[in-house]
Structures are given as C-alpha cells and as structure tokens.
C-alpha cells in the first residue's frame, strides 16, 4: 500500500513521502495562483480551480484567499460559496454537497495525530529528516448547509 493509499484510507502514513510532498506542493502552488487573481478574472480563476479541484460542480465561487493541502481529494457540489480564508486540509476525502455556503475563516481539517505524545512526537529517519505519524478522518457536509464564520 502506498503512503497516498494509506492516507486516503485513514491509516497512519508518512506525510514526508516524496509523492505526497509533490502533490501538496502543487496544491499550495495552485492555491497561491488563485489567490493572486482578482474576482473579475473569472476565466483565469476557473482554469486554476479546474486543476486544483477537478471534482467541483457548476457555479462554485471561492472568494479567496483559499488554502488547500491537496485539492483533488475534495469534492464540491454545485452552487457552493466560500468567503475569505477558506482552508481545506484534505488528507482524507472531503465531500461538500450542493449549495453549501462557508463564511469567512472556515477550515475543514481531516488530519489527525496520535493522542499519546510518545506516538505523536517527531521521529527521525536514518538520513536525519524528521517526520510525524499522521492519519485522517473523512469529512462529509450535506447539501444546503450554511457554515458560518470562524468554524
């Protein structure tokens, strides 16, 4: 089982895995590109969003700034709206239904860390690089929800 397969299945995985690091870097880069656009640059925003969130519905509007860990592991239905500072840490699948509204400063966070410090603390590989054990829990938000601000 690859580290990505473990991650998406909610099993303990190594987030420093090369493939995951590349995917996360791409998600961060696309988030920044989106954040560097204006509301009026609709076509450019759509192109970036199509690459960042290939599983999004029609008529989605993300105000920006936005922050995605990966992007492709998030599914967003039709007619969704997210206000300023929308953050999605999608180490496990995130499913958002149709017509869901997010107020400012909302975060959807799937990552989990072991509760016991002995298991949670940073570990070191033979080459000296540090990593932590992480796992995730999927999040599903049904249709027609309004998630207010600072949630």
What are these regions (language model features)?
Residues 1-59, 115-118:
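Terminal amphipathic alpha-helical/low-complexity segments used for targeting or macromolecular assembly
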Residues 66-76, 81-151:
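Flexible, glycine/small-residue-enriched loop-and-beta-strand segment within the central core
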Residues 62-63:
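Extended, charge-rich alpha-helical segments
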